[in-house]
Swiss-Prot record:
PROSITE patterns: RIBOSOMAL_L33 (PS00582). This is Large ribosomal subunit protein bL33C. GO terms for biological process: translation. GO terms for molecular function: structural constituent of ribosome. The keyword Ribonucleoprotein applies. Signal peptide: none annotated. Keywords: Ribonucleoprotein, Ribosomal protein. It comes from Streptococcus pyogenes serotype M1. SUPFAM superfamilies: Zn-binding ribosomal proteins (SSF57829). The gene is rpmG3.
Length: 49
């Protein structure tokens, strides 16, 4: 079952990206490297509940 999730950068508090994941294949929190326009570099965004 695929669910929509929000990705947040913990240090700046940005919630810019929406994506989906399969809960069966990825039960842990998703972490993706994405571009942060606020910091102007690629940083790690983490799944938020």
């Amino acid at each position: 079952m695929r669910v929509n999730i929000t990705l947040e950068h913990k240090e700046s508090g940005e919630r810019l990206y929406l994506t989906s994941k399969n809960k069966r294949n990825t039960p842990d929190r998703l972490q993706l490297k994405k571009y942060s326009p606020k910091l102007r570099k690629h940083v790690t965004f983490t799944e938020v509940k």
